[in-house]
Swiss-Prot record:
Record HAMAP family: Hfq
Calcium in keyword set: no
InterPro entries: Hfq, LSM_dom_sf, Sm
Signal peptide: none
Highest taxon, organism lineage: Bacteria
Domain Sm: from-to ranges: 10-69
Protein name, as recorded: RNA-binding protein Hfq
Function: RNA chaperone that binds small regulatory RNA (sRNAs) and mRNAs to facilitate mRNA translational regulation in response to envelope stress, environmental stress and changes in metabolite concentrations. Also binds with high specificity to tRNAs.
Keywords recorded for this protein, A-Z: RNA-binding, Stress response
This protein's encoding gene: hfq
Organism: Dechloromonas aromatica (strain RCB)
GO process annotations (BP): regulation of DNA-templated transcription; regulation of RNA stability; regulation of translation, ncRNA-mediated
GO cellular component: cytosol
Description of how the protein assembles with itself and partners: Homohexamer.
Upper taxonomic lineage: Bacteria, Pseudomonadati, Pseudomonadota, Betaproteobacteria, Rhodocyclales
Family: Belongs to the Hfq family.
Length: 78
């Protein structure tokens, strides 16, 4: 993945993780997963609900937070 993609993706996922924001993750096959982002790396997102699921990023279509996320604060920290 290019650095430009990482400049948006990492701060967004990190804000979701840090603020414990509930998310809906839609996969490319249409399945909807719900939970909180526990952790992530270059290839996977750990999504915690009643269990922790490892979701491969290449299978993710959309990440929808349950509430607005402030990325300005996250970008200022970098």
């Amino acid at each position: 993945m290019s650095n430009k993609g990482q400049l948006l993706q990492d701060p967004f996922l990190n804000a979701l993780r840090r603020e414990h924001v509930p998310v809906s993750i839609y996969l490319v096959n249409g399945i909807k997963l719900q939970g909180q982002v526990e952790s992530f790396d270059q290839y996977v997102v750990l999504l915690k609900n009643t269990v922790t699921q490892m979701v491969y990023k290449h299978a993710i279509s959309t990440v929808v937070p349950a509430r607005p996320v402030n990325l300005q604060q996250e970008q200022a920290a970098e």
